């Protein structure tokens, strides 16, 4: 499992240590990368199978990753989180109204890192319009400082990445 290359490139924006929330973590490739760097990671996903794989690899390397099964479509789910030094969302389109709740869980000077599809790729029929990250989705975090925004391509896939600072 290889972590997201742009996360590695962007780690300079993150606090040097602390607690990070990985939303919709899947198998946890980014969680594992961050834990290897010494961060305390809280990883959330709706798939028990994916979290079991993440737990297996984390235990194998004795990494500090807390996993949680959760449905992000449940209205109150995000209200019961810790406070974090950074939150990452990779290849998952969060409902726009949830960003304001999420920002309450980022510590002062903390980071929100969002990476997602900018357009539907021609080589992956599983990605639909519902998966595309839109500027208007982020309207509730406009008052925070946008540290960096980048559009990039890997093969036929185009992505957009945002780094917000609270």
Q: Where are the regions that the model predicts?
A:
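Conserved SAM-binding strand-loop segment of SAM-dependent methyltransferases
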Residues: 61-73
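A short glycine-rich, Lys/Arg-flanked "PGG" loop and its adjoining helix->strand segment in the class I
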Residues: 99-110
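A short acidic, Gly/Pro-enriched loop at the edge of an enzyme's catalytic core
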Residues: 77-86
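A short SAM/SAH-binding and catalytic strip from SAM-dependent methyltransferases
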Residues: 85-98
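S-adenosyl-L-methionine
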Residues: 1-15
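Conserved SAM-binding motif I beta-strand of class I
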Residues: 40-45
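Conserved SAM/SAH-binding beta-strand->alpha-helix loop
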Residues: 47-49
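Conserved beta-strand signature within the Rossmann-like core of class I S-adenosyl-L-methionine
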Residues: 109-119
């Amino acid at each position: 499992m290889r972590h997201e290359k742009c996360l590695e490139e962007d780690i300079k924006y993150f606090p040097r240590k602390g607690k990070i929330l990985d939303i919709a973590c899947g198998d946890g490739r980014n969680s594992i990368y961050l834990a290897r760097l010494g961060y305390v990671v809280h990883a959330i996903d709706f798939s028990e199978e994916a979290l079991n794989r993440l737990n297996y690899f984390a235990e194998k390397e004795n990494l500090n990753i807390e996993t949680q099964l959760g449905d992000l479509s449940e209205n109150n789910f995000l209200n019961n989180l810790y406070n974090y030094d950074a939150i990452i969302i990779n290849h998952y389109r969060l409902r726009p109204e949830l960003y304001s709740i999420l920002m309450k869980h980022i510590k002062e000077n903390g980071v929100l890192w969002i990476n997602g599809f900018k357009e539907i790729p021609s080589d992956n029929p599983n990605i639909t319009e519902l998966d595309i990250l839109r500027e208007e989705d982020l309207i509730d975090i406009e008052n925070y400082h946008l540290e960096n925004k980048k559009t990039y391509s890997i093969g036929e896939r185009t992505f957009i990445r945002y780094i917000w600072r609270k």
